[in-house]
A protein has these predicted regions:
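Hydrophobic anchor at the beta1->P-loop junction of P-loop NTPases
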Residues: 24
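Pre-Walker A adenine-sensing motif
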Residues: 2-19
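Short regulatory helix/loop adjacent to the ATP-binding pocket of P-loop NTPases
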Residues: 123-139, 153-155
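Conserved P-loop NTPase "ATPase switch" module shared by AAA+ and STAND
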Residues: 81-100
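Structural recognition of the conserved hydrophobic beta-strand(s) that form the central parallel beta-sheet
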Residues: 114-120, 141, 150
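Conserved lysine of the Walker
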Residues: 32-33
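Short glycine-rich substrate-engagement loop in P-loop NTPases that contacts/grips substrate
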Residues: 55-85
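Interdomain hinge/linker elements that couple catalytic modules in large macromolecular machines
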Residues: 2, 147-238
Length: 238
């Protein structure tokens, strides 16, 4: 399934030329990489940008491991900028680069460089990330699919589609799965290996089992009043 993400695509396009580093944030697996590397890249080409003026680096790719060195990445980008025409620098998972802030800030003074980056770790979940760019960071925050985006592609009976959306959410990968078992497995795995880990890392938590139990309790009482004191006492006596 191809979700066009028109709203966010327009935000990326409208930020072109604003003199800032465009920082695409959002929870993991919400579609940041696809938006940048597929949809936005396609739109740039449709606007007439030559492919050799789009510098695209997926830093999560093992084959690009050497580019996680900040000096090597800088040299790589500089070598690809061979004229004074505008270049679009698209970097995915930039937090994997040591001192990535310095790398990106280096291009603030380059007049023909337009920089767009994504990041997914705990640091990029913080509003403090924009301050790293000397007041010249422009955040574009991506959410999972809205129901309108979901239904535009899924179609069918609207009530049934809404029930599925409420039950499984709007992560693009989940929407593309057919079987309920596959949806549940994907969500379970991403919760355990990604979301829970991000919360633990960001807050330096030591009791992962306690956090997992807290999430289980909160998930079981959605739509009901929450007695914070009772929950706290549960953990005190555990």
């Amino acid at each position: 399934m191809l979700f066009e993400r028109k709203h966010y695509l327009n935000l990326l396009q409208n930020a072109d030329g604003n003199g800032m580093i465009k920082v695409i944030t959002g929870i993991r697996r919400c579609g940041k990489s696809f938006l940048l590397f597929n949809l936005f890249r396609k739109r740039l080409i449709e606007k007439g940008v030559h492919e050799d003026h789009i510098i695209q680096v997926n830093l999560e790719d093992r084959r690009n491991k050497r580019l996680r060195n900040p000096d090597v990445l800088l040299q790589h980008i500089d070598n690809m900028m061979t004229d004074t025409d505008k270049y679009y620098i698209l970097l995915d998972e930039v937090q994997l680069v040591n001192e990535f802030e310095d790398v990106l800030n280096s291009y603030l003074s380059v007049p023909n460089a337009e920089v767009y980056v994504t990041g997914s770790n705990a640091k990029f979940l913080s509003k403090d990330i924009i301050t790293e760019f000397r007041g010249r960071g422009w955040e574009i925050h991506i959410h999972p699919l809205s129901f309108a985006e979901y239904y535009e592609v899924v179609g069918g009976e609207k009530a049934e589609a809404l029930e599925q959306y409420y039950k499984y959410g709007g992560l693009p990968a989940v929407a593309g799965l057919e079987r309920a078992e596959d949806k549940q497995q994907y969500l379970r795995e991403i919760f355990e290996t990604v979301y829970l880990k991000d919360v633990i890392d960001r807050n330096h938590l030591k009791n992962a089992d306690g956090l997992r139990e807290l999430v289980r309790i909160l998930a079981s009482i959605i739509g009901s009043s929450t007695n914070v004191r009772r929950i706290a006492n549960t953990f005190k006596t555990a």
